[in-house]
Amino acid sequence: MKVRNSLKSLRSRHRNNRLVRRKGRVYVINKVQRRFKARQG
């Protein structure tokens, strides 16, 4: 999982990317290509 300041550019890299908020953190998850996981921090 990558940790990035801004997730907007990571989200646009694949059309299945989803922006999710969990426990106060913002994540990008992808059920199809799992290598696109990222967390904002």
Swiss-Prot record:
Superkingdom of origin organism: Bacteria
Keywords, in A-Z order: Ribonucleoprotein, Ribosomal protein
Xref: SUPFAM superfamilies: Ribosomal protein L36
Transmembrane segments: none
One BP term from GO: translation
InterPro entries recorded: Ribosomal_bL36 (IPR000473), Ribosomal_bL36_sp (IPR035977), Ribosomal_L36_bact (IPR047621)
One Gene Ontology cellular component annotation held by this UniProt entry: ribonucleoprotein complex
Any GO molecular function: structural constituent of ribosome
Family annotation (HAMAP family): Ribosomal_bL36
Annotated family: Belongs to the bacterial ribosomal protein bL36 family.
Full protein name: Large ribosomal subunit protein bL36
Encoding gene per record: rpmJ
